[in-house]
Amino acid sequence: MGDTTKDDGSSQSKAVRGEKRAFFFRKWTRIDIARASAVGAVHLLCLLAPFNYKWEALRFGVILAIVTSLSITFSYHRNLTHKSFKLPKWLEYPFAYSALFALQGHPIDWVSTHRFHHQFTDSDRDPHSPIEGFWFSHVFWIFDTSYIREKCGGRDNVMDLKQQWFYRFLRNTIGLHILTFWTLVYLWGGLPYLTCGVGVGGTIGYNGTWLINSACHIWGSRAWNTKDTSRNIWWLGPFTMGESWHNNHHAFEASARHGLEWYQVDLTWYLICFFQALGLATDVKLPTDAQKRKLAFAR
């Protein structure tokens, strides 16, 4: 079904009009400060890239952004969070490991947060609710861990991951892996590989993910009659690996395919199809015709 919507994409969602959480004038925990410092450092390195770069370093940064972003969407999101398909562990674990270098945290934390988002979408318990403003849902929520804990409680919704030694190992050693990787990158290519790799690559990856949490709940079109503010933003599709078909996703969250129409670019789905053709991705979930009819807008 196409984007049969009553919203032409030019209007803002009502979700942006709500009481906003105080950001600067509050108690900051050490984790908040560490996260803000890391995100700030990545963006600062990106700003320094024009003054200290090499073309091969820039290519490295773009390739890294593509690989790590695909790992986030393929592994953290569709495989681990929603269980949209199954992989053998020897393939599942490397994808989850490579997603570490998107600098978005370890699988247990990421998956837990996203499951809470779907459980409490657009409510006061949504960890990055657009009700609290664009910038809160885009990035500020990341630096307010005490508030998120108050909203959602503990990480009791990821026992399937906590029971696996590999994900506990990543949770306990994530800093070591990231520090080792970027030390090796620096020794290999020097400062340009940090400004273009960490800086450019990290900034692309960060904001690609963040725009799903913010823009895709404010602007865009609605193809399905969901009880939330989720939107599809077509032009973000290629840059977000297909994640910006967000109204499609909230309508059928277990679906391995987000770009439900042939013209809706979904790079993550193409990767899933590749592994499915090899017999490695199994139990691939898609919405049924009955599910689509239930959520379709009346014509």
UniProtKB/Swiss-Prot annotation:
Domain of life of the organism encoding this protein: Eukaryota
Coiled-coil features, chain-numbered ranges: none
Residues annotated as transmembrane: 31-51, 55-75, 174-194, 198-218, 262-282
GO CC list: endoplasmic reticulum membrane
GO terms classed as biological process: unsaturated fatty acid biosynthetic process
Membrane topology, as annotated: Multi-pass membrane protein
UniProt motif (Histidine box-3) ranges: 246-250
Entry EC number(s): 1.14.19.-
CDD domains in the cross-refs: Delta9-FADS-like
CC cofactor: Fe cation
Xref: PANTHER family: ACYL-COA DESATURASE, DELTA-9 DESATURASE-LIKE 1 PROTEIN-RELATED
Annotated protein name in UniProt: Delta-9 desaturase-like 1 protein
